[in-house]
């Protein structure tokens, strides 16, 4: 709670940080923002359509996996008088952060597809926003980021082979 309280204390003089955190919360809810961006990227870059489809699959799949893990771990969200909760959440469970998971998954996918590390900055931005919003501990967002990165790597490593097998079965 100490780190979470410190993050919020640093941000209090800058009310815009709460507005940004709230906006990111809506964007990342159920990985919908990342699904939309994947669709737009697939339309914009048709040569990489399959890869952007895998990015969407990874973001959504990792989000779903994070929700399952939340129901196993059953860690409650932060609850402390010094912590301001600035967004509504669909559940009272905290570990891991689904927002950090799907964001890191998508950012890792985007960096892989574009051969550019710049999308990776999205992950710490979302991680910090979840603490500014007062709904996650640092370990929640760190675990979510790790889960998202692994999900993306696994999806892009094995996804093309799985798709190829599905296509070959369809043609037989």
Residue ranges and their predicted role:
Residues 1-33, 66-93:
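N-terminal transmembrane-helix/juxtamembrane module of multi-pass inner/ER membrane proteins
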Residues 10, 14, 47, 72-80, ...:
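Membrane-interface elements of multi-pass transporters and channels
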Residues 14-17, 31, 47-51, 79, ...:
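Membrane-helix interface segments
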Residues 31, 35, 55, 59-63, ...:
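Alpha-helical transmembrane spans of integral membrane proteins, capturing the lipid-embedded, hydrophobic core
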Residues 40, 65, 69, 73, ...:
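Alpha-helical membrane-inserting segments
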Residues 40-64:
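Interfacial segments of alpha-helical transmembrane regions
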Residues 83-172:
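Membrane-embedded catalytic cores of phosphoryl/pyrophosphoryl-handling enzymes
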